[in-house]
């Protein structure tokens, strides 16, 4: 397998979380909370949860997105995508310490404040680099 995380050595598993905001939030308010409140919380718990890397991709570029969606007949874009890299599935399964459970619960409670969880799919998968320039 050619799994990897640029510059971080081999990584076996990646979590991708496609986020939709709660209906009462504007995209700007959602992204600000996600960046300024939730991101530091993830950083605080990263070591406890075994998170090697955490990236937020905030939706923007509305004209480009509209063109792409129109040409494909696709659904409305997500408000953002979170990507989290972990050492392995086994390491995640073994991470059942009281501190890890508490950290995960704290993150979930915070997510309920700004993410429409019922409409925000997430999954674990493996990366396969096809093009990696720069």
Region locations from a protein language model:
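Short, Lys/Arg-enriched N-terminal segments with co-localized hydrophobic residues
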Residues: 1-11
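Macromolecular interaction modules
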Residues: 11-134
